From Swiss-Prot:
It comes from Yersinia pestis. Its EC number is 2.1.1.222, 2.1.1.64. The gene is ubiG. This is Ubiquinone biosynthesis O-methyltransferase. Belongs to the methyltransferase superfamily. UbiG/COQ3 family. It catalyses: a 3-demethylubiquinol + S-adenosyl-L-methionine = a ubiquinol + S-adenosyl-L-homocysteine + H(+); a 3-(all-trans-polyprenyl)benzene-1,2-diol + S-adenosyl-L-methionine = a 2-methoxy-6-(all-trans-polyprenyl)phenol + S-adenosyl-L-homocysteine + H(+). The lineage of its organism: Bacteria, Pseudomonadati, Pseudomonadota, Gammaproteobacteria, Enterobacterales. It comes from the Bacteria. InterPro entries: SAM-dependent_MTases_sf, UbiG_MeTrfase. Keywords: Methyltransferase, S-adenosyl-L-methionine, Transferase, Ubiquinone biosynthesis. One of its GO terms (biological process) is methylation. O-methyltransferase that catalyzes the 2 O-methylation steps in the ubiquinone biosynthetic pathway. The keyword DNA-binding does not apply.
Length: 242
């Protein structure tokens, strides 16, 4: 039975949800629309493991988990993972895949703001990957993530910088020329400059610890992490120990 989603939060964009609902059945197709997410997942996972000091037996929340690519990989590392998303179909795909692979984790259809009200300072690690640019109020998500993590805990964000280069790479290149992701996946106006993200972080108990770029070379078809944050980037933050 389909979960009721008629009561929506102010920070949910129905059109954004619909984009991912439409392609949810292909989330675990390694050659499909989500191939880039599968390709970069090891880089993201290793960054999270290194910067957090490991997640074995830690309580981890993946905000905007979609079909569960990152969430499932963190559960395989021994973490107690909860995946959070507002898309019904992606969560159904995530649950089914977890059953098929035998990976134990929990998926919840709920906004991060509501989850934060119910579970303050509950998690050791919170991840929010490629989600901020898909909501009306990304600062609200940052505040909720800060509320959810324990003192001394870690919060990781990833998003796309807002400039001409990122528009050319993430929209023109990835969507129209290389067809790496479906057309219309991104709205360049919603991209977020690092200074904006750090500004929101600074208004919470979170402290910026590290920032790194994620680069794609179309000639070698290779992804890597590096210092340049012109396009995709990740930010590691840590909640102040109280």
């Amino acid at each position: 039975m389909r979960a009721k989603t008629t009561s929506r939060h102010h920070n949910v964009d129905e059109q954004e949800i619909a984009k991912f609902e439409a392609v949810a059945s292909r989330w675990w197709d390694l050659e499909g629309e989500f191939k880039p997410l599968h390709r970069i997942n090891p880089l993201r996972l290793n960054y999270i493991l290194q910067r957090s000091g490991g997640i074995f037996e830690k309580k981890v929340l993946d905000v905007g988990c979609g079909g569960g690519i990152l969430a499932e990989s963190m559960a395989r590392e021994g973490a107690q993972v909860t995946g959070l998303d507002m898309g019904y179909e992606p969560l159904q795909v995530a649950r089914l895949h977890a059953l098929e692979t035998g990976v134990k984790l929990e998926y919840v259809q709920e906004t991060v703001e509501n989850h934060a009200q119910q579970h303050p300072q509950h998690y050791d690690v919170v991840t929010c990957m490629e989600m901020l640019e898909h909501v009306p109020d990304p600062a609200s998500v940052v505040r909720a993530c800060a509320q959810l993590v324990k003192p001394g805990g870690h919060v990781f964000f990833s998003t796309i910088n807002r400039n001409t280069k990122s528009w050319l790479m993430a929209v023109v290149g990835a969507e129209y020329l290389l067809k790496m992701v479906p057309k219309g996946t991104h709205d360049a106006k919603k991209f977020i400059r690092p200074s904006e993200l750090i500004g929101w972080v600074d208004q919470t108990p979170l402290l910026e610890r590290h920032i790194i770029g994620l680069h794609y070379n179309p000639i070698t078809d290779h992804f890597k992490l590096g210092r340049n944050v012109d396009v995709n980037y990740m930010v590691h933050t840590q909640r102040d120990s109280e």
